[in-house]
Amino acid sequence: MKLTSHDIIRKPIITEKSMASMAEKRYTFIVHVDANKSQIKRAVEEVFNVKVESVNTINGLGKTKRMGVHVGKRSDYKKAIVTLTEESNGIEFFEGMQ
């Protein structure tokens, strides 16, 4: 399956820790599980029109949940922490949240 840039970036993560790291031009996203670092870098540069310096990824396993005797599982996820270059402006989407 060919992933487009909008398929790769699922949603931003808005937490106290991620908001504090925005001062250092680091932004956190939930991304597609099959996306690699180079695809994530290309997608962020294309969608937000910025230059990316580095991408760090974290794979999260979904928890097993029970409802009585029924057992289910939450979806696995991948988190990407994207660092922008010094000359790059911040991402406008996040500007009002600081």
Curated annotation (Swiss-Prot):
Entry GO terms, CC: ribonucleoprotein complex; ribosome
UniProtKB keywords: Ribonucleoprotein, Ribosomal protein, RNA-binding, rRNA-binding
GO term, biological process aspect, one: translation
Any one GO molecular-function label of the UniProt entry: rRNA binding
Record's subunit section: Part of the 50S ribosomal subunit. Contacts protein L29, and trigger factor when it is bound to the ribosome.
Family under the similarity heading: Belongs to the universal ribosomal protein uL23 family.
Record-given protein name: Large ribosomal subunit protein uL23
